[in-house]
């Protein structure tokens, strides 16, 4: 007795032209697989024209499963996502030759190539060593350096031109005629000029410039000349009250830039001469004037007590005031100058002090440079 279900499937396979499997008389496979339930969207169309759906069999048929139908279902683009879920839940794993696996391999290879390209780009972007500036940065740096060098050159030319003008003025004996001339010599940026002139520059005035002075202020009434504007203003006050302009008239003006330059002495063999092996410049022109008068000029002032001659009026007046007066210490030493006795007491301390002198601790007027040198010499002899 034959199985009715087997005859049914045999007739159906014969009538279906799309199926090429043999009938049920073929030998079954040694490892049968579970049946594959076709999706709901799959229909069979027999040649007879009537649409029939076979009822689900209660038991698995002995015929082999439809192994070749799986690639056909997986190649369908509309059911790709649905087939993936069905294969994961109900079917066995497909071989790696399916279209989904091929697509996955292609995507994986593309991602790998993209990663390689990214790594390559990162490697190219790395710079080993010192950073090299771009063309724009180099251009900006060159412009900044050129502008700074041009500004330094401009300042240097301005300094040299200003110095040449001042040298020309003093070499030709140009003198200021009043307040306006002196203000013009200073100018609005006189402080800037002075600060620039003091850097590594000096001045060597001639003997006539030293003795006469670089500037002369003349009184408009009696035509008496003065080296300082303040002295001329105080002199003009003696001519009448109409020349008094208040306290601000005594302020005068600031000295010119050349008067603040370090100066060398023009006398040969002098320690302050520029050709001396240990030459040292004097601080400014006023200091040079006093130095030249004391060391190399004539001495028109003479003490009326001892007959000592002096070149500077201030030195002569200070000396004549204290000439012949001795200052005694309780230790028995005597000094010609009060300053020398003070230095002696300060150096030895206890056991030394002024003897028989009233008002010794009172402040006295500062001694001149000549008297200070004499005091130092006396202090060395007493020690």
Curated annotation (Swiss-Prot):
Record has ATP-binding as a keyword: no
Subcellular location: Nucleus
Gene label: WIP2
Tissue expression remark: Expressed in developing carpels. Expressed in the shoot apical meristem and the replum.
Residue intervals of every C2H2-type zinc finger in the record: 217-239, 264-296, 301-323, 327-352
Motif (Nuclear localization signal): 293-296, 336-339
Gene3D superfamilies, sorted: Classic Zinc Finger
Protein's job: Transcriptional regulator required for normal differentiation of the ovary transmitting tract cells and pollen tube growth. In Arabidopsis, the transmitting tract facilitates the transport of pollen tubes to the ovules for fertilization. May play a role in the regulation of AGL8/FUL, which is required for normal pattern of cell division, expansion and differentiation during morphogenesis of the silique. Plays a role in replum development by the activation of the homeobox protein KNAT1.
Keywords: Metal-binding, Nucleus, Repeat, Transcription, Transcription regulation, Zinc, Zinc-finger
Extra remark beyond the main annotation: The fruits of the gain-of-function mutant ntt-3D (T-DNA tagging) fail to dehisce.
UniProt region (Disordered), positions on chain: 19-118, 147-191, 361-383
Protein name, per record: Zinc finger protein WIP2
Family that this chain belongs to: Belongs to the WIP C2H2-type zinc-finger protein family.
Compositionally biased intervals (Low complexity): 39-48, 66-80
Listed Acidic residues bias regions: 361-373
GO cellular component: nucleus
